[in-house]
Amino acid sequence: MSKLGVLLTICLLLFPLTALPMDGDQPVDRLAERMQDNISSEQHTFFEKRLPSCCSLNLRLCPVPACKRNPCCTG
């Protein structure tokens, strides 16, 4: 029985239980935490700010005249 205890102790020292991924360490959970942090381009300057695409907007509401000449928006 002592040989089994020594073997178990050696195995736990070589491969501790903390090496196993826990539920809180899953990538999906990390994504939810990042979304709750409210990281946005207004707070972080290294995110580039882009204007919305004219093709995704209603042309009558688009303030940019170049959007009305854009071939992808004429459909």
UniProtKB/Swiss-Prot annotation:
Residues of the propeptide: 20-50
Signal peptide (UniProt feature, chain positions): 1-19
Intrachain S-S bonds: C54-C67, C55-C72, C62-C73
Tissue expression from the record: Expressed by the venom duct.
Modified positions (4-hydroxyproline) in chain numbering: P52, P63, P65, P71
UniProt GO cellular component terms: extracellular region
InterPro entries, per the entry: Conotoxin
Annotated family: Belongs to the conotoxin M superfamily.
Further comment found in the protein's record: Negative results: has no or very low potency on Kv1.1/KCNA1, Kv1.3/KCNA3, Kv1.4/KCNA4, Kv1.5/KCNA5, Kv1.6/KCNA6, Kv2.1/KCNB1, Kv3.4/KCNC4, Kv4.2/KCND2, Kv7.2/KCNQ2-Kv7.3/KCNQ3, Kv10.1/KCNH1, Kv11.1/KCNH2, and KCa1.1/KCNMA1. Has no effect on sodium channels (Nav1.2/SCN2A, Nav1.4/SCN4A, and Nav1.5/SCN5A).
Protein name: Kappa-conotoxin RIIIK
Origin species: Conus radiatus
